[in-house]
Amino acid sequence: MEVILLEKVANLGDLGDRVKVRPGYGRNYLVPQGKAKPATKENIRYFEERRAELERQAQEALAAAEARKEQLEGLTVTISAKSGEEGKLFGSVGTQDVADAITAAGVEVARREVRMPEGPIRVTGEYELELGLHTDVTALVKVVVQSQEA
């Protein structure tokens, strides 16, 4: 299946690229998410008419992500969680907990933007987490998980 990308997609291409993808990936992910359109003659013509507008929107999204990165760089967020001996948490601190803590600190962050490659945090301590704000923009945030005072 050949599609036209309406935005930059990681490991696939940039705005306006015509790429061949597996039919299921195109029909079930790219098209419903608004990231691509099937490469038909009408859609190619439609895309060429709207290309400048789509490129402007992509630039605005990149600028907004850069501005959010400036706010997030150097930010330290503290999360309190119940823990037992040796700092082992009862439960874990996941992406939603981190996103809520950063949002409470004053910068809006969605759960899907928080990247935790080692999985949820299960022990108290300091962690450097990466936030994927845009396909080209990532920010580092320090998260301190401490034992909750009973």
UniProtKB/Swiss-Prot annotation:
It comes from the Bacteria. GO terms for biological process: translation. Gene3D superfamilies: Ribosomal protein L9, C-terminal domain (3.10.430.100), Ribosomal protein L9, N-terminal domain (3.40.5.10). It holds the Pfam family Ribosomal_L9_C. InterPro entries: Ribosomal_bL9 (IPR000244), Ribosomal_bL9/RNase_H1_N (IPR009027), Ribosomal_bL9_bac/chp (IPR020594), Ribosomal_bL9_C (IPR020069), Ribosomal_bL9_C_sf (IPR036791), Ribosomal_bL9_N (IPR020070), Ribosomal_bL9_N_sf (IPR036935). GO terms for molecular function: rRNA binding; structural constituent of ribosome. One of its GO terms (cellular component) is ribonucleoprotein complex. Keywords: Ribonucleoprotein, Ribosomal protein, RNA-binding, rRNA-binding. Belongs to the bacterial ribosomal protein bL9 family. Binds to the 23S rRNA. HAMAP family: Ribosomal_bL9. This is Large ribosomal subunit protein bL9.
